[in-house]
From Swiss-Prot:
Species of provenance: Eliurus grandidieri (Grandidier's tufted-tailed rat)
Protein name (record): Cytochrome b
Record lineage: Eukaryota, Metazoa, Chordata, Craniata, Vertebrata
Annotated gene: MT-CYB
A Gene Ontology cellular-component term: mitochondrial inner membrane
Subunit structure: The cytochrome bc1 complex contains 11 subunits: 3 respiratory subunits (MT-CYB, CYC1 and UQCRFS1), 2 core proteins (UQCRC1 and UQCRC2) and 6 low-molecular weight proteins (UQCRH/QCR6, UQCRB/QCR7, UQCRQ/QCR8, UQCR10/QCR9, UQCR11/QCR10 and a cleavage product of UQCRFS1). This cytochrome bc1 complex then forms a dimer.
Cofactor note text: Binds 2 heme b groups non-covalently.
InterPro entries, per database record: Cyt_b/b6_C, Cyt_b/b6_C_sf, Cyt_b/b6_N, Cytb/b6-like_sf, Cytochrome_b, Cytochrome_b_C_euk/bac, Cytochrome_b_N_euk/bac, Di-haem_cyt_TM
Residues the record lists as binding heme b b566: 97, 196
Further comment found in the protein's record: Heme 1 (or BL or b562) is low-potential and absorbs at about 562 nm, and heme 2 (or BH or b566) is high-potential and absorbs at about 566 nm.
Function text: Component of the ubiquinol-cytochrome c reductase complex (complex III or cytochrome b-c1 complex) that is part of the mitochondrial respiratory chain. The b-c1 complex mediates electron transfer from ubiquinol to cytochrome c. Contributes to the generation of a proton gradient across the mitochondrial membrane that is then used for ATP synthesis.
GO term, biological process aspect, one: mitochondrial electron transport, ubiquinol to cytochrome c
Residues annotated as binding a ubiquinone: 201
Keyword Nucleotide-binding attributed: no
Cell membrane as UniProt keyword: no
Length: 380
């Protein structure tokens, strides 16, 4: 008798995606982060749902409702901090996942890669709107500053900003619509993630060597289910440590002050996972130029398949490109640090240099390194 998982219309899809999926036998732990992102998304939707049961999206009660969740709701503090720090874990996994794709040349599966970029933008939009909801000082001013960037769009900018705000400033209408969008977007992320997986399973997973692995595949279950579960346990351990020992480590103290339109915080900054893009935005004195640089800092990823010059897909056997890759990682860490610093000397100059280096490595140095390495191989 044929197993039900191979015949049932629904179970058949699950079987082909997570059980009998032919997987390269040599993929390392860097391939764990896709499943960890799935776990993070489930956690965020679950905790977010329970938070939404007690949250009120009104400017007069939003801050108080978050305080009420932490003080009066059973384990409300745990749900709130799991949700806030879960977002940080989500972005750590996202950055590693994208970084792994860049290192091992996974971007050569263009549909999967482009779907991933759309997912990245959607998750970033979701996180930004979620940060506005507690209605603290940084929520309010962050929303004001970031939405106001759209006014840099020629001709329609100001009208567009007022349309998004639902008035002439960030107010009740803005908070209500941000809550509505923050609630719906994670479900859109789930749908996009399914399309992302659909495209991935058309071509199959890449592997560290960057070579075709059709001749050497193993079933996903039990080999990689067990491997993924280890990753999940480590993720939960790290998240639990953060939530139970240092829940406010990654937050901003200003957000414990209720939003006040009459009092601007000395230094407005977004959550830590947006600081690299914020630093790139601030490094350009022109408003429109800054907005374009901000968008391009993520959109530049879409150019990677077209900038690939090497005959090898992965960086595994390419020391020159490896060096550039790790300089890029260090550069992103510098940008993250700069994004959290005040706009003054020497931080302005460091930010500008780091921003130039970021785009130069991706657009010029990496393609050049690929060609140089190919020529060295020809000479050998």
């Amino acid at each position: 008798m044929t197993n039900i998982r191979k015949t049932h219309p629904l179970l058949k899809i699950v079987n082909h995606s997570f059980i009998d999926l032919p997987t390269p036998s040599n993929i390392s732990s860097w391939w764990n982060f896709g499943s960890l992102l799935g776990i993070c998304l489930i956690l965020q939707i679950a905790t977010g749902l329970f938070l939404a049961m007690h949250y009120t999206s009104d400017t007069t009660t939003a801050f108080s409702s978050v305080t009420h969740i932490c003080r009066d709701v059973n384990y409300g503090w745990l749900i709130r901090y799991l949700h806030a720090n879960g977002a940080s874990m989500f972005f750590i996994c996202l950055f590693i996942h994208v970084g792994r794709g860049m290192y091992y040349g996974s971007y050569m599966s263009i549909e999967t890669w482009n779907m991933g970029i759309i997912l990245l933008f959607t998750v970033m939009a979701t996180a930004f709107m979620g940060y506005v909801l507690p209605w603290g000082q940084m929520s309010f001013w962050g929303a004001t500053v970031i939405t106001n960037l759209l006014s840099a769009i020629p001709y329609i900018g100001t009208t567009l900003v007022e349309w998004i705000w639902g008035g002439f400033s960030v107010d009740k209408a803005t908070l209500t619509r941000f809550f509505a969008f923050h609630f719906i977007l994670p479900f859109i992320v789930v749908a996009l993630a399914m399309v992302h997986l659909l495209f991935l399973h058309e071509t199959g997973s890449n592997n560290p060597s960057g070579l075709n692995s059709d001749a050497d595949k193993i079933p996903f279950h039990p080999y990689y289910t067990v491997k993924d579960i280890l990753g999940v346990f480590l993720l939960i351990l790290f998240l639990a440590s953060l939530v139970l020992f240092a829940p406010d480590l990654l937050g901003d103290p200003d957000n414990y002050t209720p939003a006040n339109p009459l009092n601007t915080p000395p230094h407005i900054k977004p959550e830590w996972y947006f600081l690299f893009a914020y630093a790139i935005l601030r490094s350009i004195p022109n408003k429109l130029g800054g907005v374009l640089a901000l968008i391009l800092s993520i959109l530049v990823l879409a150019l990677l398949p077209h900038l690939h010059t090497s005959k090898q897909q992965s960086l595994m056997f390419r020391p020159l490109s490896q060096t550039l890759y790790w300089i890029l990682v260090a550069d992103l860490l510098v940008l993250t640090w700069i994004g959290g610093q005040p706009v003054e000397y020497p931080f302005i100059v460091i930010g500008q240099l780091a921003s130039i280096l970021y785009f130069t490595i991706i657009l010029i140095f990496m393609p050049m390194a690929g060609m140089i390495e190919d020529n060295i191989l020809k000479m050998a």
